[in-house]
Amino acid sequence: MSVSAFNRRWAAVILEALTRHGVRHICIAPGSRSTPLTLAAAENSAFIHHTHFDERGLGHLALGLAKVSKQPVAVIVTSGTAVANLYPALIEAGLTGEKLILLTADRPPELIDCGVNQAIRQPGMFASHPTHSISLPRPTQDIPARWLVSTIDHALGTLHAGGVHINCPFAEPLYGEMDDTGLSWQQRLGDWWQDDKPWLREAPRLESEKQRDWFFWRQKRGVVVAGRMSAEEGKKAALWAQTLGWPLIGDVLSQTGQPLPCADLWLGNAKATSELQQAQIVVQLGSSLTGKRLQQWQASCEPVEYWIVDDIEGRLDPAHHRGRRLIANIADWLELHPAEKCQPWCVEIPRLAEQAMQAVIARRDAFGEAQLAHRVCDYLPEQGQLFVGNSLVVRLIDALSQLPAGYPVYSNRGASGIDGLLSTAAGVQRASGKPTLAIVGDLSALYDLNALALLRQVSAPLVLIVVNNNGGQIFSLLPTPKSERECFYLMPQNVHFEHAAAMFELKYHRPQNWQELETVLADAWRTPTTTVIEMVVNDTDGAQTLQQLLAQVSHL
């Protein structure tokens, strides 16, 4: 009997089972112990293969692919610390709802905890973060193939969001020619191999039903809080709120067009919060709110009812309001709860939003970080998409810009780490095939610098703007101790990115003004390659501009 041949047949069943649940993208890191999985993936024509030498970046690449495709994405890694490097992407997926299937190769049990190289305790290493964890046995013909395929089917058939960890131990030898070992074991699945359906089909999830008293609540004074949504959901939500006559407070990821722009500014005005206190119901569509003032208002508001609608399960309200947690696809929920045409009940807030935007426009000429955040809507590629980094840049765009309704915007706003942002952006571009504008800070770019290797392979123009404010200037907005701020919080690195771009043979530009930036962008959108644009700005200007605008708008 050939161990290597049966390893491959066992792996082939696993990989084929994944295809029955919509897995098309598969991300593979180099490794020996994962050879059965890698070869099975390579031989299965249903997969689009992606490779990367860094497992942490590979996990985030898969995350980006899943964000756009809305389908589960598989990742194959070898044993040892390679597995641990998938943790950040798994955590993010669990919070933002992407589906990741982590196939981690392992040593067989007799080689664990006895000094064998590259052997660690992998089962359960991700604790409670995966939605499902499966520790498979060593491949053996004593276990029927129908057990293996139904085990995979159960985990994926009940997966609505987050990750599945499938730990796969393989004994040596890992290499060798294929023979008939295990062929009859594999063939006992019969015509399943010619079918395209799961062996075991799970019943669909039951979503929240129509709220029978909606006809009553839609006639009341309401507020719509729009969190992270798809482009389709964002457009529908904006029209729904407009019809109801309810003010919509839109997050940067809401894709609603933010009809009341600069919410993070005008929510700091007492007139706005006073008017919002009249709301009898708040309906929050989507989660992951970015703006600090929006988070503060959400925590302090006291409507009679607070409803949260999202297809992600779990508690999504840090303020623990009395109300309803409705698990549903947002677009479907809006169809079930039609708006009734009413006149807008808020008078002060639209005026404040307009004045706040005018205050931002008055400062748009300086070549700076805050001004880029405001101007970003002018630089978006046609029929494209935007990927926004974390820390200061996403807060500035949220507060100072007004993105078009229905324009796709992506970010990692679950755990909101700065790790893996370039890798995630690469996945977003690959899955969509669209022109992509990605904006990150200098520390974020440094953190994921080797992901520039992924950006060498793009199917449409990709522009990466690195806003270099020389450190983590988000801490300038926080009451960090002034004497320790630079050394222990900002951590300026005093570096530039020209040589990093050259190392990976990417185009690089460092514009000095808006005209130069716009010229570079116009050229970049013409060719399906990656262009790195480093925008060097004064260290604290972005944070200071935001603070000045907050003070100005609070006194309107």
From Swiss-Prot:
Extract one GO molecular function annotation from the record.
magnesium ion binding
Q: According to its UniProt record, in which pathway does this protein act?
A: Quinol/quinone metabolism; 1,4-dihydroxy-2-naphthoate biosynthesis; 1,4-dihydroxy-2-naphthoate from chorismate: step 2/7; Quinol/quinone metabolism; menaquinone biosynthesis
> Which InterPro entries does the record associate with it?
MenaQ_synth_MenD (IPR004433), MenD_middle (IPR032264), THDP-binding (IPR029061), Thiamin_PyroP_enz_TPP-bd_dom (IPR012001), TPP_enzyme_TPP-bd (IPR011766)
Catalysed reaction(s) here are: isochorismate + 2-oxoglutarate + H(+) = 5-enolpyruvoyl-6-hydroxy-2-succinyl-cyclohex-3-ene-1-carboxylate + CO2
Task: Enumerate the Pfam families for this protein.
Answer: TPP_enzyme_C (PF02775), TPP_enzyme_M_2 (PF16582), TPP_enzyme_N (PF02776)
Q: What is its EC number?
A: 2.2.1.9
What are its GO biological-process terms? menaquinone biosynthetic process
Name what cofactor the protein needs: Mg(2+); Mn(2+); thiamine diphosphate
Transmembrane region positions? none
Q: Is Transferase found in the keyword set? A: yes
Among its keywords, does the record have Metal-binding? Answer: yes
Cofactor notes = Binds 1 thiamine pyrophosphate per subunit.
Q: By its UniProt entry, which CDD domains does this protein fall under? A: TPP_PYR_MenD, TPP_SHCHC_synthase
**Entry keywords, A to Z:** Magnesium, Manganese, Menaquinone biosynthesis, Metal-binding, Thiamine pyrophosphate, Transferase
Q: Which protein family is named in the record?
A: Belongs to the TPP enzyme family. MenD subfamily.
- What task does this protein carry out? Catalyzes the thiamine diphosphate-dependent decarboxylation of 2-oxoglutarate and the subsequent addition of the resulting succinic semialdehyde-thiamine pyrophosphate anion to isochorismate to yield 2-succinyl-5-enolpyruvyl-6-hydroxy-3-cyclohexene-1-carboxylate (SEPHCHC).
Q: How does this chain assemble?
A: Homodimer.
* HAMAP family xrefs: MenD
- Its name, as the record gives it, is 2-succinyl-5-enolpyruvyl-6-hydroxy-3-cyclohexene-1-carboxylate synthase
Source species, please?
A: Shigella dysenteriae serotype 1 (strain Sd197)
Taxonomic classification, please?
Bacteria, Pseudomonadati, Pseudomonadota, Gammaproteobacteria, Enterobacterales
